[in-house]
Amino acid sequence: MKKIILLSFLFLFVSEGIYAAIGKKNKKKVTNPIEVKKDSVNADYKKVTKDAVIKQGLFTTFLSKKENNLYFEIPDSAFSHTYLLTNRIAETSNTHDYVAGQMATNPLMIRFSKDGQKVYMHLVQSSNMVDQNDPIASAFNKNFADPVLKGFKIVARNQGNVVIDVTSFFGGNEKCISPIKQESPLAKLFGGGNSLKGTFAADASNILSVKTFPNNIEIKSLLSFTTTPLNQPYSVTVHRSLFVLPDTLMAMRLQDNRVGYFSSDKSLYTSSKDKIIPQTFIHRWRIEPKKQDLERYFKGELVEPMKPIVFYVDTAFPEKWRTVVKQGIEDWNMAFEAAGFKNVVKALDYPSNNPDFDPDDMRYSCVKYAATSIANAMGPSHIDPRTGEILTADVIWYHNVISLLHNWRFVQTAAVDDRVRKAVFDDDVMQEAIRYAAAHEIGHTLGLMHNMGASYSFPVDSLRSPKFTQKYGTTPSIMDYARNNYIAQPGDLEKGVKLTPPNLGVYDIYAIDWGYRLIPGADTPEKEKTVLDAWIEKKKSDPMYEFGAQQVFGTVDPTDQSEDLGDDHLKAGDLAIRNLKVIMKNLETWTFDKGARYDEVENMYIEVVRQYTRHLRHVMPYVGGIRFQEVRQGEDSSAKNYIDKATQKKAV
């Protein structure tokens, strides 16, 4: 801005001298120079827009054809909004750290401010809160200011708008959105520290494209690196989304340890309490009735949401798998019906007739197929940090998860089910496994955590009951790591015993109801709490509705374990090992392929050993184990109970 003012001053000064000289010579009256308005279109703006591809939307963007520089023209109104900036991998030459479709960094909540010379990008803090009408608000605001993440020089003006050059931010290796993982010094202690490292190659990097829409801007850039110490090239196409967050905030719901939701912690500063109030709010989608249906909803009628949750399924999935992936997605409608909504979750193929569709665009939630050797799937979601509202979500489906599903089904049920005694399952068997895996990951995208204690609520003997298993499957929650029925014995399948998890468990339906049902007359999270507590109290006596948190750093509570079934791991393990002995006796016969190497036999032998080891590990936590329970004041029970001596001796 100083340069612009200085140039204007010099221009006026020189012009006045020229006109004075002419006046003396020609004796003509000198006219006053035209005043240049501060916010008028200037020469710098014309320079920026010349030969640029101009797109209008959230901001007007200019991508110059020659230099490939990217400019944002930011209207004055934009400085009153809050935004989310996401950073996703669109393509990669190396899947060591990321696969295509995966978020490379956590989304950043940002806002913009400006002065006479610069536009500042601030990182907005949301973990501390205050009511702006509280007397302490002014002091709070001074002590929790939003730090500046980046400053951009104003290079031009257009009336009330300012123009900034964002080329280096989106086309360079900006640390806060770099595809090179930033690791903490403690990473190696927890199995990390092996991420790719490299030197940015600016000459092999570029901004590829920009798309601008009313509420978002989508930018693709090619970033290249030379990795160390092997000196290998590494290139990624990154997709950045700048998305304006809603001005009307979603109603927040307080988290409760007795129902497993992902959540965000906040600290409430207030002058009405004697301390800072810690609060935790669940992550959930904004599922609300249409205004005209609100009365019907509170009368108990099923209504459609104002905005459904739509998942687009990658057409890279083989058709025979894509169909059941979509079924697994829409299985969750049963749970939302319990909360009073119908047709909440929809599954569609990637659209072929929408030129604006991009699976990396923040507006679209997608199930993406990643052709890698990783044997896994994951379902991350991305929230408005202010409220916990889930804005978008993805399921990353790694190609080799198929081998994981195959191996589980073989080692857990081959002793009782002759359909899985082969290297390649029939379509109907694999489709059942895929549907379960898809539904599990969608559960995460809806806000649900793993419920590792769910399967412990089932008596071991019940898992050999046709009536019980046909009704409940292997677990009351598909958010548990409770796979296939390894407790069933030869002959049980023919009697009608079910070998697989349910489409949804009773806990899953209950949890969605608890998290998404609207409560009439409760206009604050605190007013909801009494009703939410009553819903939990109603189910308290039934262990099927208990939540067991995942134990990450070692298993202390034997009732909250992964890959387990039933309420007696010793008895369940004995039955399971009987089945493993049957499999070992027939392994070569069931995997026989004349003329083939023994690779498949060896692989399945390893899988049997792994399954055997799981059963041993399920018993180990009983020795010195503690059962934890979420207890509230006034309840006649203990928060922790040591495993009794007799059970510990039996486990040994």
What function would you assign to each model-found segment?
Residues 1-24:
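Bacterial Sec-dependent N-terminal signal peptides
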Residues 24-317, 344, 350-404, 409-427, ...:
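Auxiliary tRNA-acceptor-end handling modules of aminoacyl-tRNA synthetases
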Residues 79, 318-344:
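Zn2+-dependent metallopeptidase catalytic core
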Residues 321, 325-328, 430, 434, ...:
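Stable alpha-helical elements in mature extracytoplasmic
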Residues 330-341, 443-444, 448, 484, ...:
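Sec-exported extracytoplasmic/periplasmic mature domains
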Residues 349-370, 432-489:
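The catalytic-center signature of Zn2+-dependent metalloproteases
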Residues 378, 383, 389-397, 435-446, ...:
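Extended catalytic-interface subdomain
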Residues 455-652:
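Conserved catalytic/binding loops enriched for acidic/polar residues
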